UniProtKB/Swiss-Prot annotation:
It is found in: Cytoplasm. InterPro entries: Arg-tRNA-ligase, Arg-tRNA-synth_N, Arg-tRNA-synth_N_sf, ArgRS_core, DALR_anticod-bd, Rossmann-like_a/b/a_fold, tRNAsynth_Ia_anticodon-bd. The gene is argS. GO terms for biological process: arginyl-tRNA aminoacylation. This is Arginine--tRNA ligase. It is an enzyme of class 6 (ligase). Pfam families: Arg_tRNA_synt_N, DALR_1, tRNA-synt_1d. GO terms for molecular function: arginine-tRNA ligase activity; ATP binding.
């Protein structure tokens, strides 16, 4: 057994060897054409793993699946060191039950030795960009979901040996940023006693009139946080002097641009505070503005033109994105020479490529599916392989309270922020928030049940796991922390004990598979099933350590220690604490 193998890999390798042995007597069969795979048994009564090899390859084998399965069982049964039982279930399934001794040995070399996870043969340098929220306001709930999942993905990828840089892209350039500055300026002038139209009725009012009459743009920002920022700017002596001078000179556009910079700086400070409170730390904050200042946005056009993917149309420069699955070709430079947002995005990803990343992963918000093909095409036109760039869509979050959806709206100022959510959930906000956001696949909408999230009983899936960990800690406090692998090896194995051993041994492969698939929700699914197996073990009378003989107690304690390690390490990977003692909030 290699140290760098999961239990599933060991079983699969054994199956492959057995299949090769079986078909060596079938000279007419091509070995390379076979599909050989295993999966977890759908019903634990049949075994730990199963394979439908004979059914899936019946046409290639040109033999009865039942007969092939029986012959395969005969070969596999010789591996008594690995399998306790191998049997056949019609119409062609082979079931495996791992031997207790093998499970114990495997657990000793993995979960109990600190070598939790196998490492990839070729570690990659990976750029993982997520959250990247507009710096126009506080982080919202969708950003919180991306933060929890992106951070967990990074932890999983690092756990199996990859080098990962977590990156936040700051969209601090463009018209929306200018409108943010105008919105702040409107509030500043209001605080100084100026009167003006509170809201533009149409979206075609010239900017000069908007600024002159102190009109809040239709696409501006109306949240209370804008008023707070305006107030804080006026309280800053240096900024207040600048504001006074520019107002007197009626240099409203210049002041609006300055207000945009100040507002973004303020918002970024609060966004980072929210992320810190959520346990998310980025390796790099990358400003879009720096790309424009370094002339990297327009200069990337040369690369695109060299690729032959640009054509002229009505004075515009257009990227042939339809060649990559887009529904129409996309303008990258307007007829007045200004770049579109797409060109800035292309320049940003060129910068990532130049930084030497083997893989580039982006997590985007809902409703961005259509953008994938055009950016992926641009990345390919720059010479980067399609398979090395991947976009993951983080779908919408629905907050539910008493079974009803809670509305969210950023510009109207009535949205729920990441900070609101953490505060609402109390002292457990970080743990509960991160766990709930990771519970479902990112590509599916998430219903976030606020009532369940506030529940501090074991009905709450987070507390269910934390209570399990705390129970084990209390066991060790009661009977001491001494354990014995020799005592564990001679324990009589009840169904609860054997089931728990298998779930412990599954931990490395569950993490390895979750990391490779970039699906953090697999970890929470596994941990819930694991905790159920531990609870069944814990409640069984013959597993009460304080009532057991010394030898049995030491053996059971060894199993409990492994279970504790799984819970602690599993929760750590998703950014959730594993307390030794549970205390309810008053």
């Amino acid at each position: 057994m290699k140290e760098n193998e999961t239990l599933k890999q060991i079983v699969l390798k054994t199956l492959e060897e057995s299949v090769n042995s079986l078909i060596s007597s079938f000279p007419e069969v091509e070995k390379e054409a076979f599909k050989i795979k295993i999966e977890y048994s759908r019903d634990e009564k049949f075994g730990d793993y199963s394979t439908s090899f004979a059914l899936e390859n019946s046409k290639l084998l040109k033999r009865n699946p039942i007969q092939v399965s029986k012959e395969l069982v005969e070969i596999l049964q010789k591996r008594t060191d690995l399998f306790e039982k191998v049997d056949f279930t019609p119409p062609g399934f082979v079931n495996f039950r791992i031997s207790t001794s093998f499970l114990l040995n495997y657990i000793e070399t993995s979960v109990l030795s600190g070598n939790y996870f196998p490492k990839v043969d070729l570690p990659l340098k990976i750029n993982l960009e997520f959250v990247s929220a507009n710096p126009t306001g506080p982080l919202n709930i969708v950003s919180a979901r991306a933060a929890a999942n992106g951070d967990t993905m990074a932890s999983l990828l690092k756990a199996i040996g990859h080098n990962v840089d977590k990156e936040f892209y700051i969209n601090d350039y463009g018209n929306q940023v200018f409108l943010l500055g105008v919105s702040t300026l409107v509030r500043i002038r209001e605080l100084k006693g100026e009167e003006g139209t509170q809201q533009e009725t149409t979206d075609d009012t010239p900017i000069e009139i908007i600024l002159e009459k102190n009109i809040l743009p239709a696409e501006g920002y109306r949240g209370e946080y804008i008023k707070d920022i305006a107030s804080s700017l006026l309280k800053d002596p240096k900024k207040n002097v600048t504001i006074e001078n520019l107002l007197k000179q009626k240099k409203y556009k210049e002041l609006a641009e300055l207000c945009a910079v100040w507002t973004i700086e303020n918002n970024l400070i609060w966004q980072r505070k929210d992320l810190d409170a959520f346990g998310v730390e980025f390796d790099c904050y990358f400003s879009e503005r720096t790309l424009h200042e370094a002339d990297k946005v327009l200069s990337v056009m040369k690369d695109l033109e060299k690729s032959g993917k640009i054509f002229q149309e009505d004075g515009k420069k257009v990227f042939r994105s339809t060649e990559y699955g887009d529904d129409k070709d996309r303008v990258v430079v307007r007829d007045d020479g200004r770049p579109t947002y797409l060109l800035a995005d292309i320049a940003y990803h060129k910068d990532k490529i130049e930084r030497g990343y083997d893989k580039i992963y982006d997590i985007w918000g809902p409703d961005h599916h259509g953008y994938i093909s055009r950016l992926s095409g641009a990345v390919q036109s720059l010479g980067y392989k399609k398979e090395n760039f991947k976009v993951i869509i983080s779908q919408q979050v629905n907050l539910l309270e008493s079974g009803q959806k809670v509305k969210m709206s950023k510009r109207a100022g009535s949205f729920q922020t990441m900070s609101d959510l953490i505060g609402f959930l109390g002292k457990h906000g970080k743990d509960v928030g991160r766990y709930f956001f990771v519970m479902r696949s990112l590509d599916a909408p998430l219903d976030f049940d606020l009532d369940l999230a506030k529940d501090e009983s074991d009905k709450n899936p987070v507390f269910y796991l934390q209570y399990a960990h705390a129970r084990i800690c209390s066991i060790f406090k009661e009977v001491g922390d001494q354990t014995s692998k020799e005592a564990a090896a001679i324990l009589e194995m009840s169904e609860e004990r054997k089931r728990l051993l298998f779930w412990i041994a599954r931990f490395p492969e569950e993490i390895f598979d979750s990391a490779n698939a970039m699906e953090p929700h697999r970890v929470t699914n596994y941990l819930q099933s694991f905790a159920k197996a531990f609870t069944s073990f814990y409640l069984a009378k013959d597993n009460r350590l304080k009532d057991a003989s010394k030898e049995v107690r030491l053996g059971l304690a060894r199993i409990c220690l492994a279970a504790k390690n799984v819970l602690a390490e599993g929760l750590k990977l998703i950014g959730v604490s594993a307390p030794e003692r549970m205390e309810k909030e008053n």
